Structures are given as C-alpha cells and as structure tokens.
C-alpha cells in the first residue's frame, strides 16, 4: 500500500524532537511492506502561511505519487491538508487526533476547518479512550477508533546506557520530558520537588517557562534532545514525572515504564488507561499536596521497577 503521511510536526536536524513520535510509525509501516511518503512541516513558529504550503505540498504529492490512502496526524491543520490531498487523489483519508488539536476546537479557525475533516474522513482515530470520548461528544454520530502509537520495546529496553546526570546530582533523580509550557504543569512539578526536599530534578525539553525553572536549587534544564537520546535520560533517572494539567495520552510515561521506571502521571487524560498501581502514581495535577505525596510514594518504589515494564507491554 502507498501511504501519504501528512503532519504539521516532523523532526529535522534543527528541531530533532518535533513530531519524533511519528518516526517509529513510519519505520514499522515500511517494515510491513508499505511505501510511505511524507508531506510535513519541520519547524516551530513562523508564519501561518506555512499551513497553506503544507496543503499545497500534500496535494502535489497526492497528484504526483498517487497514494492508496492519506494518513493525516492532527485534525487541524494537517487534517485539512490531508483532506485536500485525499480529494485530489480520489482516495480515503484516515486522520488521527493527538490532543492539542481537540483542545483547540473552541477556537474559530480550527473549529470551522475541523468539521469537514471529521465528516470527510473514512476513519477517525484517537490516541486514548479519553480523547475519543471528547471527540464523540463534540461530533454526535462519530465513532472513533482508539489506537495509541505505543512504544517500540526494542528502543526502550532495560539496560540502556544512562546519560550523564547533570552535576552527578543526588538520588532520588526525577526526570520530566516534554515542552516547558503551562499545560505540562512544569512549575507545579518544580514547586512540589522543592517541598520534597531531596534529590535532583532534570527537565529535558524547552519552552516559554524555562526561565521559571532555571536557577532553582536541585533543578537543571537540559533543553531539547533528539528522541533517540530520550532512553538514556530515562535510564539515568529513578522516577519519570508527567503531572500535566491534561495529557491526552502520555507517551513519555509509557516510554519510562518500558524502561522499568516508576512514573508520576496525571489523572486528567490518557495515563489512567495504562498506569497501574505497581507501575506508578496517578495524581490530580491541580492538587499540590497530592503531587508532593505522589512524589514521596514514587521515590519509595523500586528501581528498576519491573512491574512498570509488564504494564507497558
């Protein structure tokens, strides 16, 4: 099968972490014998005209390459670009929602442009039952497939060489992987860590809240790293923390569990669907006392935590 993958997030040399979760998907589709071509945006920021260019690129690829199906990631704007490409080639559109696209549906442009995508797609996929429920409530009559992208257990296998922990910081070593934005609750995590009163906390990622984290005692911000380096960072930590205000799926938590690491994850979104009591601690992200208590419980769990990998598999 010839698959045209359309997305507004795809890694590049300049931004190796952008949409890196899609790389294993392409690899596995090709391993199954499918041909995959990508129409994508590979940088953050810039003019909104980049979305028009994505649509033009996707339509050109569809007309030139003649795929059997268009597979768009994110309802908007990639979904709209994918719908145009599918119509140009006369083939079905499959679109996958990842979370931020659904959160943006209360804004006028995404709301107006997403409805025809949902109605015109042969299949709509959500990465968690929680996200599927939100979509189905918004679009009566819609029946979402639920299929997360998962984790390749070969890439996130116990025994990965650990990264050098900044300053050889003390245990317990806590790690947070992701964008440093309000939704990820990174400041709340740093505040809870300060109240924990011991250990070290490393953030792998970047974003507008970096300045609110740097300079705190025991806290280091490493910045963005290629996705291939994430297993080494997880292997170096004792606990992976993802107490987001909302997390539609929670890929970083699943990756950590695959590497036998305990996780602290949010109750808001997808993590309750796979984080078991033996694998980690679920906390209400806006409850500061619960987050502090969750960190206390998590750092008392075994390292490595073999039950976490069992749950991830």
PLM regions and their residue ranges:
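Conserved donor-binding/catalytic core segment of Leloir-type glycosyltransferases
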Residues: 4, 167-198, 202
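Nucleotide-activated donor-binding/catalytic signature segment of Leloir-type glycosyltransferases, i.e.
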Residues: 211-228
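Aromatic "clamp/platform" in nucleotide-sugar-dependent glycosyltransferases that forms part
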Residues: 245
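Acidic anion/phosphate-binding donor-loop and adjacent secondary structure
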Residues: 105-106, 151-166
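Short hydrophobic beta-strand element within catalytic cores of glycosyltransferases
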Residues: 262-265
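Short alpha-helical donor nucleotide-sugar binding micro-motif in glycosyltransferases
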Residues: 224-225, 232-237
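Carbohydrate-associated surface elements
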Residues: 130, 150
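Conserved acidic donor-binding segment of nucleotide-sugar-dependent glycosyltransferases
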Residues: 277, 281-288, 297-303
């Amino acid at each position: 099968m010839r698959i045209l993958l359309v997305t507004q997030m795809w890694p590049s040399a300049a931004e190796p972490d952008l949409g890196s979760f899609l790389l294993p998907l392409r690899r596995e589709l090709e391993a199954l014998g499918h041909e995959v071509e990508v129409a994508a945006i590979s940088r953050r920021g810039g003019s909104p005209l980049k979305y028009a260019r994505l649509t033009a690129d996707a339509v050109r690829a569809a007309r030139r390459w003649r795929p059997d199906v268009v597979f768009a990631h994110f309802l908007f704007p990639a979904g709209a670009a994918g719908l145009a490409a599918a119509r140009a080639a006369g083939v079905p559109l499959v679109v996958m929602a990842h979370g931020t696209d659904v959160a943006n549906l209360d804004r006028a442009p995404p709301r107006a442009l997403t409805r025809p995508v949902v109605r015109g797609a042969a299949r709509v996929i959500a990465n968690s039952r929680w996200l599927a429920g939100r979509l189905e409530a918004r679009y009566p009559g819609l029946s979402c497939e639920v299929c997360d992208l998962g984790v390749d257990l070969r890439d996130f296998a116990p025994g990965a060489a650990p990264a050098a922990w900044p300053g050889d910081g003390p245990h317990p070593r806590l790690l947070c992987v992701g964008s440093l934005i309000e939704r990820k609750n990174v400041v709340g995590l740093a505040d809870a860590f300060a109240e924990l009163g011991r250990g070290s906390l490393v953030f792998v990622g970047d974003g507008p809240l970096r300045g609110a984290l740097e300079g705190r005692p025991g806290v280091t911000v490493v910045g963005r790293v290629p996705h291939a380096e994430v297993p080494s960072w997880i292997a170096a930590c004792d606990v992976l923390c993802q107490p987001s205000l909302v997390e539609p799926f929670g890929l970083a938590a699943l990756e950590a569990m695959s590497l036998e690491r305990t996780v602290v994850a949010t109750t808001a979104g997808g993590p309750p669907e796979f984080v078991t009591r033996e694998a980690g601690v679920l906390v209400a992200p806006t409850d500061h006392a619960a987050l502090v208590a969750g960190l206390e419980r998590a750092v008392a769990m075994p390292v490595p935590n073999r039950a976490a990998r069992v749950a991830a598999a």
